[in-house]
């Protein structure tokens, strides 16, 4: 039978519950315990698929096509496992399921209430994860902050859960903030005391306190928290601010988080095999070259909108013993006159995914700048579509080449709606979503990077390259380097005569890992590093001559 850890958060939002859950998953997995992590989100949307990135950050897509919270990306990257739609639960999906059951008569005419019907549905979703993969430990993060009205049904459900499955099979872990007050020159525990008091009023006594803080918790403060919150002092864990999220697992290991969790669950201690993770951190902390990469997007004011892209770039940089400096460029600011000012001097340009016409012209201009100036370029999803539009307009000389998404009556719709999307009315969960196979051209750069003929990548789109233009694009120098196995859908394009110009219809960033950088991001960063070294060499030669 699986054991269960519930991670709640107090005092403020965005405190790092997801990173704590992911880090605990890493530490337990390093001890050869199997782990699955799920997120309970208190918003009433069925999923985040139709939410603005400014509201929610990126939408993370799983192998089975679920549109989920970005925390699932952290879970997958830290534990190196593939999750599914079972690992993402929202209030909206719970109420939808309950109401569907009511319409079918499943409640036998009874009055449908939050307790027991909604709470039972929540508990069933948690148990479903345990039944699906039978992990040793299921870690559940409850979104929001203790005290929020939206989270109450989830908190009530996990309160009941310990009674249902047994006291020794459940751990309640509360992540809280210990603020540093500069004027007083001390850290304050009162917000945490009140947060725990709020949690107790719901009927949950935390077993472990994970204290987010700017400075290490001194023994006296740990003892104070232990006394006022009724938590053993060894279960008061310091989660000090770190320069990288990938340092957090090792920091929490030093604090004994995994050991305390296993003791509370009556599971035996095991030696943690963290050598690979320790090597990763050593590489991060002693980088060589610094590479400047421009991300040209629509939502650059909120970095979380492109979180997996940023992490995939970091993974590739770590593997190359380098570090990256990001130049965030709003696509709306890029035009013929400003492209040079925004993009000059960068070592590589990434145009990530997105939806809608706003900023598209700027993305197209940035792609032209990368192509003409031989700057390594990686386009993702809409980034591929924009690169096709750019080539159609500027090289193939197609009048008003465009996507039918942006211009319905364009005479040259080089990007068109997928046929199966023609009759789709609802927006949520109706795109081409999830893991699909892609067959690579053996004579392509993509093939040399992946090292295999058939690959699998995650998708999230409605539009594709219009095959009516495939021959023309090939004749003018474009290479289709990856397609669906039947050859119908173009999945990867590249420019053979460019230092590195690859664009994909899929989202490779979702399958990158800290210890296994994605091949396309690795290839892109290698090209960026090579370009920088060549520029440095050329600059040195000029200096020597002068």
UniProtKB/Swiss-Prot annotation:
It comes from the Bacteria. ATP binds at residues 14-19, 71. Keywords: ATP-binding, Glutamine amidotransferase, Ligase, Magnesium, Metal-binding, Nucleotide-binding, Pyrimidine biosynthesis. One of its GO terms (biological process) is 'de novo' CTP biosynthetic process. GO terms for molecular function: ATP binding; CTP synthase activity; glutaminase activity; identical protein binding; metal ion binding. It catalyses: UTP + L-glutamine + ATP + H2O = CTP + L-glutamate + ADP + phosphate + 2 H(+); L-glutamine + H2O = L-glutamate + NH4(+); UTP + NH4(+) + ATP = CTP + ADP + phosphate + 2 H(+). It is an enzyme of class 6 (ligase). Residues 1-267 are annotated as: Amidoligase domain. CTP binds at residues 13, 148-150, 188-193, 224. L-glutamine binds at residues 354, 382-385, 405, 462. Pathway: Pyrimidine metabolism; CTP biosynthesis via de novo pathway; CTP from UDP: step 2/2. UTP binds at residues 13, 188-193, 224. Residues 292-534 form the Glutamine amidotransferase type-1 domain. InterPro entries: Class_I_gatase-like, CTP_synthase, CTP_synthase_N, GATASE, GATase1_CTP_Synthase, P-loop_NTPase. The active site is at 381 (nucleophile), 507, 509. Mg(2+) binds at residues 71, 141. Allosterically activated by GTP, when glutamine is the substrate; GTP has no effect on the reaction when ammonia is the substrate. The allosteric effector GTP functions by stabilizing the protein conformation that binds the tetrahedral intermediate(s) formed during glutamine hydrolysis. Inhibited by the product CTP, via allosteric rather than competitive inhibition. Its EC number is 6.3.4.2. Gene3D superfamilies: 3.40.50.880, P-loop containing nucleotide triphosphate hydrolases (3.40.50.300). Homotetramer. PANTHER family: CTP SYNTHASE, CTP SYNTHASE-RELATED. Belongs to the CTP synthase family. Catalyzes the ATP-dependent amination of UTP to CTP with either L-glutamine or ammonia as the source of nitrogen. Regulates intracellular CTP levels through interactions with the four ribonucleotide triphosphates. CTPSs have evolved a hybrid strategy for distinguishing between UTP and CTP. The overlapping regions of the product feedback inhibitory and substrate sites recognize a common feature in both compounds, the triphosphate moiety. To differentiate isosteric substrate and product pyrimidine rings, an additional pocket far from the expected kinase/ligase catalytic site, specifically recognizes the cytosine and ribose portions of the product inhibitor. This is CTP synthase. It comes from Microcystis aeruginosa (strain NIES-843 / IAM M-2473).
């Amino acid at each position: 039978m699986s054991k269960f850890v519930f991670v709640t958060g107090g005092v403020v939002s965005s405190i790092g519950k997801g990173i704590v859950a992911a880090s605990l998953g890493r530490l337990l997995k390093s001890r050869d315990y199997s782990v699955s992590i799920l997120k309970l989100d208190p918003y009433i949307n069925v999923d985040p698929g139709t939410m603005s990135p400014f509201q929610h950050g990126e939408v993370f897509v799983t192998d089975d096509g679920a549109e989920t919270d970005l925390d699932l990306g952290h879970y997958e990257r830290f534990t190196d496992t593939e999750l599914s739609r079972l690992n993402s639960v929202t209030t909206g999906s719970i109420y939808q399921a309950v109401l569907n059951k009511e319409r079918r008569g499943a409640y036998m005419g009874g009055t449908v209430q939050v307790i027991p019907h909604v709470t039972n549905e929540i508990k069933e979703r948690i148990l479903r994860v345990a039944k699906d993969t039978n992990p040793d430990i299921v870690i559940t993060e409850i979104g929001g902050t203790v005290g929020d009205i939206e989270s109450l049904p989830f908190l009530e459900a996990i309160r009941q859960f310990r009674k249902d499955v047994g006291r020794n099979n459940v751990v309640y872990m509360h992540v809280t903030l210990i603020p540093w007050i500069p004027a007083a020159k001390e850290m304050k525990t009162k917000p945490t005391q009140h947060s725990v008091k709020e949690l107790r009023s719901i009927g949950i006594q935390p077993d472990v306190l994970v204290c987010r803080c700017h400075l290490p918790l001194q023994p006296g403060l740990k003892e104070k928290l232990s006394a006022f919150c009724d938590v053993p002092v060894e279960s008061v864990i310091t989660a000090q601010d770190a320069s990288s999220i990938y340092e957090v697992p090792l920091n929490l290991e030093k604090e004994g988080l995994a050991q305390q969790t296993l003791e509370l669950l009556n599971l035996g201690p095991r030696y943690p095999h963290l050598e690979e993770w320790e090597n990763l951190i050593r590489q991060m902390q002693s980088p060589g070259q610094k590479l400047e990469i421009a991300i040209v997007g629509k939502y650059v004011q909120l970095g979380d909108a492109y979180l997996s892209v940023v992490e995939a770039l970091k993974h590739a940089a770590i593997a190359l013993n380098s570090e990256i400096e990001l130049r965030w460029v709003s696509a709306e600011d890029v035009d013929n006159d400003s492209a040079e000012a925004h993009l000059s001097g960068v070592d590589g340009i990434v145009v990530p995914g997105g939806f809608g016409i706003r900023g598209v012209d700027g993305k197209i201009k940035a792609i032209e700048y990368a192509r003409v100036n031989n700057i390594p370029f990686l386009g993702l999803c809409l980034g591929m579509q924009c690169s096709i539009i750019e080539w159609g307009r500027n090289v193939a000389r197609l009048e008003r080449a465009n996507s039918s998404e942006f211009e319905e009556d364009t005479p040259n719709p080089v990007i068109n709606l997928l046929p199966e999307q023609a009759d789709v009315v609802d927006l949520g969960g109706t795109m081409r979503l999830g893991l699909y196979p892609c067959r690579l051209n053996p004579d392509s750069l993509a093939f040399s990077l992946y090292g295999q003929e058939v690959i699998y990548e995650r998708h999230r789109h409605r539009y594709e390259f219009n095959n009516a233009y495939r021959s023309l694009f090939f004749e003018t120098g474009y290479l289709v380097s990856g397609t669906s196995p039947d050859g119908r859908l173009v999945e990867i394009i590249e420019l053979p005569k460019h230092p590195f110009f690859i664009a994909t219809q899929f989202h490779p960033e979702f399958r990158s890992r800290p210890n296994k950088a994605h091949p396309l991001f690795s290839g892109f960063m290698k090209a960026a590093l090579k370009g920088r070294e060549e520029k440095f060499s050329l600059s040195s030669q000029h200096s020597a001559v002068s």
